[in-house]
Amino acid sequence: MNERIFRENTRPVQVGNLTIGGSEELTIQSMTTTKTHDVEATVAEIHRLEEAGCQIVRVACPDERAANALSAIKKKIHIPLVADIHFDYRLALKAIDAGVDKIRINPGNIGRRDRVEKVVNAAKAKNIPIRIGVNAGSLEKKIIQKYGYPTADGMVESALAHIKILEDLDFYDIIVSLKASDVNLAIEAYDKASRAFNYPLHLGITESGTQFAGGIKSAAGLGAILSLGIGNTLRVSLSADPVEEIKVAREVLKSFGLSSNAAMLISCPTCGRIEIDLIRIANEVENYIAKIEVPIKVAVLGCAVNGPGEAREADIGIAGSNGEGLLFRHGKIIRKVPEAIMIDELKKEIDILAEEFFVKKIDLESLR
């Protein structure tokens, strides 16, 4: 477990307009909480997810009503759509025909080989990948009988069995997940899977819990896996508004420097030295930069002891003291501003920095 693994050679798999695996950045996914047959509600939720930074969205497809709604949903959203299928191969066929960008199935639980073959052939014809979703809580009986309880080896064995079914049908556009609610089990399963095959891995800690506890549990588990160099796409699973899943996922990726299009906030812990309303200012700035797709660090520091030094580590920042603040940019003081306009002035500088980034990006792209 202590050997660091880098997965640059992971097989690239196309999901809509995104490439999962290869040398591409990790993508963030979520799943809707609406009834999929309610097109209006589902599309509205997906639009909120898109705005929050979701890059791929999955919807449940438990019946024909849901399957029949997929085409209408697909036409009204702007990110790849994944259909989650269990047991009924006909729903997978309907989803593929509706134009989804990926299906999530376990080939071993949709029936006879001829049914699997129909799904695979349909997916091949439309270049639609398949995600094999192994879950510690629903492993096959024979695997539980073999190992006695859910184990990492059992999860990888299950994944390999499903992979073989697809490979035997000459299908290789495969993504694999090995989810568990036990953090240590998930870490071990993903570690072993990364050594067993080179298909892209979809990361997740399943049934992680509520917004607060589940967010921490997911961050701990996903962070440990990411620190091994493992993972190509991820979902934070919370018993909460799915938009909250995106917020946690973005922060996890930013913490590891794995997101090139997200701003990061640095703010100091509160203490008796603070002489400005740091908590209010930090929260407002965090909300402001949440949708800024620029890899900048923004610092909000509350005193003159550590503030100036820590602010210099950021691209832009402010260090407050005695009801006023020093604005820093790339380690240099820009100006001193009173607390009453501190946030507005910082926002202006953030906007200027973001605009400069986009101009440079356009200039670089024009030279290629």
Swiss-Prot record:
Disulfide connectivity? none
**Which positions bind [4Fe-4S] cluster?**
268, 271, 303, 310
- Cofactor: how and how many bound: Binds 1 [4Fe-4S] cluster.
Q: Which cofactor does the UniProt annotation name? A: [4Fe-4S] cluster
A GO biological process of this protein is: isopentenyl diphosphate biosynthetic process, methylerythritol 4-phosphate pathway
Q: Which UniProt keywords apply?
A: 4Fe-4S, Iron, Iron-sulfur, Isoprene biosynthesis, Metal-binding, Oxidoreductase
The record's EC number reads 1.17.7.3
Pathway in which the depicted protein is active:
Isoprenoid biosynthesis; isopentenyl diphosphate biosynthesis via DXP pathway; isopentenyl diphosphate from 1-deoxy-D-xylulose 5-phosphate: step 5/6
Q: Which GO terms describe its molecular function?
A: 4 iron, 4 sulfur cluster binding; 4-hydroxy-3-methylbut-2-en-1-yl diphosphate synthase activity (ferredoxin); 4-hydroxy-3-methylbut-2-enyl-diphosphate synthase activity (flavodoxin); iron ion binding
Q: Which Pfam families match?
A: GcpE
Task: Describe the reaction catalysed, as an equation.
Answer: (2E)-4-hydroxy-3-methylbut-2-enyl diphosphate + oxidized [flavodoxin] + H2O + 2 H(+) = 2-C-methyl-D-erythritol 2,4-cyclic diphosphate + reduced [flavodoxin]
InterPro entries, A to Z: Dihydropteroate_synth-like_sf, IspG_bac, IspG_bac-typ, NO2/SO3_Rdtase_4Fe4S_sf
Q: What does this protein do?
A: Converts 2C-methyl-D-erythritol 2,4-cyclodiphosphate (ME-2,4cPP) into 1-hydroxy-2-methyl-2-(E)-butenyl 4-diphosphate.
Q: Which NCBIfam families match?
A: ispG_gcpE, PRK00366.1
Among PANTHER family, the record links this protein to: 4-HYDROXY-3-METHYLBUT-2-EN-1-YL DIPHOSPHATE SYNTHASE, 4-HYDROXY-3-METHYLBUT-2-EN-1-YL DIPHOSPHATE SYNTHASE (FERREDOXIN), CHLOROPLASTIC
Similarity comment? Belongs to the IspG family.
- The protein depicted here goes by the name 4-hydroxy-3-methylbut-2-en-1-yl diphosphate synthase (flavodoxin)
Q: Specify the species.
A: Listeria monocytogenes serovar 1/2a (strain ATCC BAA-679 / EGD-e)
Q: What is the lineage of its organism?
A: Bacteria, Bacillati, Bacillota, Bacilli, Bacillales
